A protein has these predicted regions:
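N-terminal Rossmann NAD(P)H-binding glycine-rich loop of SDR-like oxidoreductase domains
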Residues: 3-22
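NAD(P)H-binding glycine-rich loop region in Rossmannoid oxidoreductase-like domains
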Residues: 47-85, 93, 111
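Flexible, glycine-rich beta-alpha linker
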Residues: 111, 155-172
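Substrate-positioning beta->alpha
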Residues: 167-173, 187-209, 216
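Mid/C-terminal beta-alpha module of Rossmann-like enzyme folds, strongest
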Residues: 208-273, 301-311, 318-328
C-alpha cells in the first residue's frame, strides 16, 4: 500500500510522516514546500495543477492536509483556489486512477462560534473564508464518495486547535507570553478550551487507515478539556515550578487593555502581542465534543502529557536548530 500525504511538509504532515516511518508504512509527500524531515520522500507539486498531481497517480490512499488557513492570506481568492478547487483536482486524480480511499483534514472552523459541546451534528455556521472553504471542500469529497459508495472510503476529520513542538500558532503564542513573565490572567479562568496534541492527531489519521468502506466524519479533540485556570497552572508549574495562575485581573480590564493595544497598533502600524481579538478569544469558551470512542481510538498521549512535552521542548531544553511551522 502506497500513501501520499498531500501537504505533508507542514506541521501535521511532518508528525504523521515520522509516525509512518516508525511504523514502516510506505509513504510519499506531495507539497509545494520541500520537506525538512523527509527530503527523500518529497515530490514537488501544487494541488492547483492537475499535471503535477499526476506524479502521485500510483497511490492507494490520499491524505489531504493541504490548505490555506492564515488570517492574512492575500489575495483572498487563494482560499477557494487551494481549499476548494484543489480538492476538486484531488478527487479528479482519485477518480481517474482508481484510488478509493481519501482522508481529509477539515476543521471545527466550519461550526464558527459554536455552542459548548458541539459535536459532529452541530450547526454549520462558519464566519470566515477558512471555515467556508473547508466546508465546501468537504462537499467536494462527499460528492466523490457518493459516486461509488460501495467501493470508496472517505474519512473527514475536523480537528480543533492543534499544538505541539515547533508549531507557532495561538497556543504557542499563549505559552510564550506566560514564559516571558509578561502574562496576566483575565477573568475567572473557568472558560474551556478544546485542544488537540499533534501526535494524537497523527495517530488518529494513522488509525483511520483501517476504516472500512463508507463515509466517516469525526471531530478531533483531546479529552478531557482544560479550562484556562488548568492550562495556565500547568504551564507555570512546568516553567517556574509555580502551579498557579499568578496575577489575575477582572475581565473588563483585559478588554480595555486589548482596545488600547488596538489603537497603539493602528498608530505605529505594527502588530502587538495583545489585541482586543486575542483577549476576546482568551476569555471565550471554545469547547467541542466528538464521537471518537465509536472509532475505537485511544490517544497515545494525554492532553497534559502533550502540553508538558511541548513546554519542555520549546522553553527548557536546548533546541537551537529546531524546525518551526508558522500558523495563525
Amino acid at each position: 500500500m502506497k500513501i501520499s500525504i498531500i501537504g505533508g511538509s507542514g506541521f501535521v504532515g511532518s508528525n504523521l510522516s515520522k509516525l509512518f516511518k516508525k511504523n514502516n508504512i510506505n509513504f510519499q509527500i506531495f507539497d509545494n514546500v520541500k520537506s525538512k524531515f523527509f527530503p527523500e520522500k518529497y515530490i514537488h507539486g501544487d494541488i492547483r495543477h492537475n499535471d503535477e498531481l499526476k506524479e502521485i497517480a500510483d497511490s492507494d490512499v490520499l491524505i489531504n492536509l493541504a490548505a490555506v488557513h492564515r488570517d492574512d492570506v492575500r489575495p483572498l481568492s487563494l482560499y477557494d483556489e487551494i481549499n476548494v478547487e484543489g480538492s476538486k483536482n484531488i478527487c479528479k486524480l482519485a477518480r481517474e486512477n482508481g484510488i478509493n480511499k481519501i482522508i481529509f483534514t477539515s476543521s471545527v472552523a466550519v461550526y464558527g462560534f459554536a455552542k459548548p459541546n458541539t459535536n459532529e451534528n452541530g450547526e454549520i455556521n462558519y464566519f470566515n473564508d477558512y471555515g467556508r472553504t473547508k466546508y465546501l471542500a468537504e462537499g467536494v469529497f462527499i460528492e466523490w464518495y457518493n459516486e461509488d459508495p460501495v467501493n470508496r472510503t472517505l474519512v473527514i476529520i475536523r480537528p480543533t486547535v492543534i499544538f505541539g513542538k515547533g508549531n507557532r500558532g495561538n497556543v504557542y503564542n499563549l505559552l510564550n507570553q506566560i514564559n516571558s513573565k509578561k502574562f496576566a490572567m483575565f477573568g475567572n479562568g473557568k472558560n474551556i478550551k478544546s485542544m488537540a496534541y499533534v501526535k494524537n492527531v497523527a495517530a488518529f489519521i494513522n488509525h483511520s487507515l483501517s476504516f472500512e468502506k463508507g463515509l466517516h466524519l469525526y471531530n478531533y479533540i483531546d479529552k478531557p478539556d482544560m479550562n484556562m485556570n488548568q492550562l495556565v497552572s500547568i504551564t507555570r508549574g512546568v516553567l517556574f515550578n509555580k502551579p498557579n495562575v499568578g496575577l489575575r485581573m477582572p475581565a473588563f480590564i483585559g478588554k480595555l487593555i486589548g482596545y488600547v493595544a488596538d489603537i497603539i497598533s493602528f498608530i505605529i502600524k505594527k502588530n502587538l502581542p495583545i489585541s482586543s481579538i486575542r483577549v476576546k478569544k482568551f476569555l471565550s469558551t471554545t469547547q467541542f465534543d466528538s464521537s471518537l470512542e465509536i472509532a475505537n481510538f485511544k490517544a497515545p498521549y494525554s492532553l497534559e502529557d502533550g502540553l508538558q512535552k511541548t513546554l519542555k521542548y520549546e522553553f527548557i531544553e536546548d533546541n537551537k536548530n529546531k524546525v518551526t511551522f508558522e500558523t495563525e
